[in-house]
């Protein structure tokens, strides 16, 4: 979710410096080896699920036929499962302990627990394995946590072999909290069935030996799973409107007041669905021919160094399921979905699925808002955004585009969100910001409200602080301390890392980095090192020094002006030897010469500027100097030493000095100490102060209104 601005604006549910750097192989920007986007994933799992929703008891009763194909060279003797809904079973679960019953601005209701029971599990031959299923706690040893289960198999699965299981389960949905559940007759059904973990072969994500990767459900962790094919039959009361992952293939009205809907989707790693009798269905289409102009195709092809065929998109059917009171905003949601399909598709590769469903959660279902599942996303808005002036806040658009963006990272690239959340959340925050800027402009991408404009960078840096140095970006999602730090280290700081990188390598090079990464790793589960390798390859430079500091380290960037001043060059006094011989220059003689220099405007000034690195992280920066009546001079500092002194002898005094004048280093925790003005017009500073005061007042009043 867009945590920077939305956490402030919305109540639930809305709630030349680099030339000195070491080169990688080759020089300049390399021509990365790029192949076409993969058409299909390696389908390791096949799910055929039948589920019935009891809207009164809020329970699911289902059966699941699961086929798993061993992707490794190992003989595998057990399967590991996620039973996510057990995270909401009681106060002893790891999820509830870590969250304290509060997450993403939502509070768990103590009388509405959730759970899942596997009532039967058999092999295709009929062997009953139900009693063999045991819970495991691989992360924290909490014996009360039942979100992971291990199943020994009667016969091991050889390399390339398969096993099929028939599973029956009953699940109790909690009141909406943390991505799933119900609110009255609104249902978001996510992480709801017994789901296999990932058996990682040796070499995948750097593993030395093959093994299961199946983490417990933590408060700040999301998901990781193999790609496969899903066929799901959902039976619900006929009065309910259903939306789900994938394409609806069949609809059958039963004789008991229910209807069964069949959905199918391949090349995905999860399946979620929603139900609500109050949904208003808004149908639309993204047209690759009408929603993208020939000129836009041409510009993007040139930007990326790709052919027109490679950047040409496909049509997509869009379904928006709106709450009746938000129907006036349906066009905004549709357009945001179109904008996401357009720009993510152009920049990173065509969307490979035929459908996209956008869900508007019911009032009070805050825990269901701002969430992503394959081909299905949840947004989040308020009736207040129906009316001027709050309709100028782009919250519905930002949430919709951000959640759609996850289709490209969480859903297609599919990193392990438990262990490296930034590869989804951070990269998606960066790419969402780029889309918002492309659509609305960089100065007003987030807000255009009563004369105030706010862009992505304005909101992004709100959480940056000299004290934000206690966690590494690359870390297990549940390890950030305090737990609220997850948003900064998984979302905001990685986006600043990427934008800082872009500011130095250039927009075109960064666009090619991102395109290459997505093309190469679609459907393949990369790790951080794979992204870093693409950066080094495409830029032709080794950025290991940068990523080691900002991704694996905890320190911050902070440059400041230590001292700055201009002093009149005094005429010499005393016994002076010169070509004319030895002369005695008295104080009166020197003073006279100084007055003459002033009158003739030939006086000189010694200017000294001391710049300092307060933070531990270094980054090359420019330092800009403005002398009275002269053009700005820019010099490069590699930023490595603690201090550097610049000296000048000029006929003019120094007016101002500024480190990183273009504000390329978004990671700098304090831009206020980057500059110093010695003389000249102070009105620009006053103007900025007024704008920020207005910003603060506007935000506070907005929060009050909501």
Give residue spans per PLM region.
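Hydrophobic helix-coil surface modules that form long, contiguous segments used
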Residues: 196-212, 218-401, 430-433, 442, ...
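Acidic/His/Gly-enriched intrinsically disordered linker/tail segments
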Residues: 300-305, 370, 376, 425, ...
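Amphipathic alpha-helical substructures
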Residues: 326, 350, 443-444, 487-576, ...
């Amino acid at each position: 979710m867009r945590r920077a601005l939305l956490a402030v604006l919305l109540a639930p549910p809305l709630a030349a410096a680099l030339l000195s750097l070491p080169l990688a192989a080759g020089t300049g920007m390399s021509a990365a080896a790029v192949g076409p986007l993969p058409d299909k994933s390696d389908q390791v799992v096949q799910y055929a699920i039948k589920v019935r929703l009891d809207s009164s008891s809020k329970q699911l009763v289902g059966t699941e036929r699961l086929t798993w194909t061993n992707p490794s060279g190992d003989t595998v003797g057990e399967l590991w499962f996620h039973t996510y809904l057990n995270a909401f079973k009681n106060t002893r679960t790891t999820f509830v302990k870590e969250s304290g019953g509060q997450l993403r601005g939502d509070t768990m209701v103590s009388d509405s627990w959730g759970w899942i029971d596997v009532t039967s599990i058999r092999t295709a031959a009929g062997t009953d394995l139900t009693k063999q299923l045991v819970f495991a706690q691989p992360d924290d040893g909490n014996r009360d946590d039942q979100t992971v289960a291990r199943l020994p198999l009667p016969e091991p699965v050889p390399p390339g072999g398969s096993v099929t299981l028939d599973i029956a389960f009953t699940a109790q949905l909690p009141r909406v909290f943390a991505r799933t559940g119900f609110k009255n007759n609104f249902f978001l059904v996510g992480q709801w069935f017994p789901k296999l973990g990932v058996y990682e072969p040796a070499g995948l994500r750097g593993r030395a030996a093959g093994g299961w990767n199946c983490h417990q459900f933590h408060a700040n962790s999301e998901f990781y799973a193999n790609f496969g094919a899903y066929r799901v039959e959902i039976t619900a009361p006929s009065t309910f409107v259903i939306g789900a992952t994938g394409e609806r293939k069949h609809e059958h009205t039963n004789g008991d007041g229910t209807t069964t809907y069949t959905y199918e989707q391949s090349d995905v790693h999860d399946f979620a669905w929603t139900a609500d009798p109050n949904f208003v269905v808004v149908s639309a289409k993204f047209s690759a021919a009408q929603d993208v102009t020939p000129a836009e195709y041409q510009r993007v092809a040139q930007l990326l160094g790709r052919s027109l065929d490679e950047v040409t998109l496909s049509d997509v059917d869009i379904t928006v399921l709106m709450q009746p009171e938000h129907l006036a905003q349906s066009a905004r949601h549709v357009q945001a979905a179109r904008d996401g399909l357009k720009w993510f598709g152009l920049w990173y590769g065509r969307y490979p699925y035929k459908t996209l469903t956008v869900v508007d959660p019911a009032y009070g279902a805050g825990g269901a808002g701002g969430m992503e599942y394959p081909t299905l996303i949840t947004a989040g808005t308020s009736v207040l955004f129906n009316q001027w002036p709050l309709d100028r806040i782009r919250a519905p658009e930002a949430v919709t585009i951000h959640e759609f963006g996850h289709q490209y990272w969480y859903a297609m690239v599919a990193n392990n969100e438990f262990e490296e959340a930034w590869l989804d959340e951070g990269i998606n925050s960066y790419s969402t910001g780029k889309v918002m800027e492309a659509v609305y402009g960089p100065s007003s991408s987030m807000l255009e409200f009563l004369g105030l404009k706010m862009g992505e960078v304005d909101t992004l840096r709100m959480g940056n602080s000299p004290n934000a140095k206690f966690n590494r970006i690359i870390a297990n999602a549940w390890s950030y301390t305090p737990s609220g730090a997850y948003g900064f280290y998984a979302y905001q700081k990685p986006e600043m890392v990427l934008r800082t990188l872009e500011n130095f390598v250039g927009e075109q090079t960064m666009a090619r980095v991102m395109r290459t990464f997505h093309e190469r790793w679609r459907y393949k589960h990369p790790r951080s090192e794979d992204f870093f390798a693409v950066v080094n390859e495409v830029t032709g430079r080794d950025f290991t020094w940068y990523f080691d500091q900002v991704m694996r380290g905890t320190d911050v960037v902070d440059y400041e002006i230590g001292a700055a001043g201009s002093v009149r060059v005094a005429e010499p006094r005393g016994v002076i030897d010169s070509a004319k011989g030895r002369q005695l220059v008295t104080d009166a003689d020197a003073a006279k010469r100084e007055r003459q220099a002033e009158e003739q405007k030939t006086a000189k000034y010694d200017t000294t500027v001391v710049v300092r690195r307060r933070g531990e992280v270094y980054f090359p920066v420019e330092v800009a100097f403005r002398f009275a009546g002269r053009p700005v001079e820019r010099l490069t500092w590699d930023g490595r030493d603690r201090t550097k002194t610049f000296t000048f002898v000029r006929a003019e005094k120094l007016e101002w000095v500024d480190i990183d004048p273009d504000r390329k280093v978004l990671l700098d925790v304090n831009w206020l100490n980057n500059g110093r003005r010695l003389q000249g017009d102070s009105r620009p500073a006053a103007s900025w102060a007024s704008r920020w005061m207005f910003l603060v007042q506007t935000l506070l009043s907005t929060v009050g209104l909501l």
